[in-house]
Amino acid sequence: MVQSSMTESNRTASGTPVPGRAWLMLALATVGFAVNFWAWALLSPLGPRFKDGLDLSSFEQSLLVAVPVVVGSLGRIPVGALTDRFGGRVMFPIVSAATIVPVLYLGLAGHSSLAALLVGGFFLGIGGTAFAVGVPLVNAWFPPERRGLAIGVFGAGMGGTAISALTTVKLVDANSMSTPFLITAGVLAVYAVAAALLLRDAPGRTVPSEPLARRLAATVRLPITRQASALYAVAFGGYVAFSVYLPTYLKTGYGLSQADAANRMAGFVLLAVAMRPFGGWLSDRIGPVRVLAASLTTVVAGAVAQAFTPALAPVGTIAFLAMAAALGAGSGATFALVALRTPADQVGSVTGVVGAAGGLGGFLPPLVMGSLYGAYESYAIGLVLLAIVSAGALAFTLTAVRAPHAGGEGKARTGRRREPRTSGTTA
């Protein structure tokens, strides 16, 4: 049993051929994810400007950038379940087209008051649900031993937030407040048409027949749903929190200009994006548990170091870049675990719940950081809390997640490659 498992675990990625069309679908899905995330993140780089122009408090500014996050996160639950039912070919064009509406509203009329921005930000959250469309689409096209890498590559589409960070403020300064929103709406429209024409679901895709409510209830009962939700809330939630709040943190804590803070946030995002497919690829080889453990350990160390508010160069920069790399790799490893342990006809539903947990994990920290800074004029307590939560996630990974569960998860692994062992036991 042990020898057979080890042989299967060590099989090279080249052992199972992947059709060229699968790579095309992966590319299309990744582009769609990036474009929708670009739209989803449009408000974050402009947060400091809205704060000054509308005389917002630190909490109001945090709320403004957090609203799209929570809506996009909760929306992933029904969107993931709908993707299981109707497929990515239908859902990707719908989500992309629907996101155009709040983008145009914000660019043309919705930036004159906090109330208008919150309304626009609420519906801007639609763009954040694209993640729950792409994962089941990509998962169905690739064999089990390639899914960690494939979903990691798809996850790199979260780099759409870097596009927003690098371009939004510059476009506003060079033209007008409406410019970045109009450009993004145009790109979304082009992608929606391209996806409708070119995107295809995998042959033989499993279509669930149960009602939506029953499928969601069954999804929540799966051990992998609860495990991955907890881990993704820390890994991806940390990434989202930094991507929306880092410009404010750097401007307030280190006195950087808005443009400089946005550029540094873009660097953080790009590194996290690059490390996400690496985390998936590495999970295919040594197992997602090991990758998660290493990633969470790095986050603990980086958060503790940054809690002392060191000089930005070099210690602060190193701490943030280390956390960016770890959060990206950890996000990739989490969905490698999902791909490994989830039944084929429930990948969309599980992705929706796990993705929601990750987004909600990114919703609370900006609010906490804004409130703590308003009360104490320091971010140290917030970073200590990040270290504590990450340490708890590390302990959870090495205990509950590391040990296989019986029941639903056992069925999920039927006919699929075993996860590489994280120890010499046969448990």
Task: Cite the ranges covered by each PLM segment.
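Juxtamembrane intracellular "pre-TM" segments in multi-pass secondary transporters
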Residues: 10-19, 201-229, 416
